[in-house]
Amino acid sequence: MRALLKQGTILAGALCLAACAPVEREIPIAQRIASANPAVSVTARGETEPVGTNNADAADDPAIWRNAVNPAASLIVGTDKKAGLYVYGLDGAKRDFIDAGRVNNVDLKADVTISGAPGILVVASDRNDVANAKLALFRLDPASAKLTALGTIAGGAGEAYGVCLGRDAQGVSAYIVLKDGTIHQVLIDASGATPTGKTVRTMKLGTQSEGCVVDDRTGKLYVAEEDVGLWRFDAGSTSPVMIGAADGKAIVADAEGVALAAMGETGGYVVVSSQGDNAYTVYSLPDERYVGRFRVVDGASIGGSEETDGIELMLGDFGPAYPGGLFIAQDGHNGAMAQNFKLVAWADIVAALGLN
């Protein structure tokens, strides 16, 4: 009887260890907002039509092509990470869709030699095979807004998450961020009939990472490690430098999308999505100093953005609604419809934060 009692006590203790272990409870959004640094409010001037996948976490990351001749005819490429890529006009209307399966993040570069002629290269992180990351390449036709698939390039062992493009003297590189924090710089050659890639540098962050952006002027790579914060890798380096911690103040985890506004030779701003409190954190360049935060809130006819994954930012004239630049944020909660992307005038953000 004592043996049975002892065994029962041991069993009960084991069950308690499993069942009574501390449970990490999510902090309510109102508390996260209250604990974080203040954020100024701006409203969106436009939004895209929802992606095609309903009632799911589907929209993820946008990229921008600016039409210098006719800025109002610029285009947006956005991922539906369960289906493929959409192309939108600045009016938010869908112009094209290409079935590419599970593509997560996207970026693009103009004036890239594609099959012997200059064109707009679109690159997405392809996670259709979770064990083997790939880069999916496309050509964007600015006249028709149509995407043409060019093929895929190996991106390393692991699941593809983030991607961003950079250009230097060697050419155009895709920086593919794997789920485990590994980052490969892959030099792309799309000039021939079949695109090829060569891994020229590998970096590593400790945990799950995704959003990234490259400053082509300096070669610096900025990467968001979701639970940790924003890092910088200098050109050619494999050693990360912390820019901003996900401390619940400046950045509330997850740190997600990263975008850059380049001004002059080295100036401008880096923006990171502070997903945990529906805000965006801004650091100045070149000193990488924290300068403030903003939030996209509900306007008269267009909703705000919440739980943002990917963001994009480009300066320049985008027509009367966006004369100084365009900021785009994925909206994780778009009413009763599928997720979409919100369009914000950079001038409104500059005014709200009192930036130069």
What feature does the model see in each segment?
Residues 20-356:
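Sequence/structural signature of beta-propeller domains
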Residues 13-14:
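Residue-level signal for mature regions of secreted extracellular proteins and peptides
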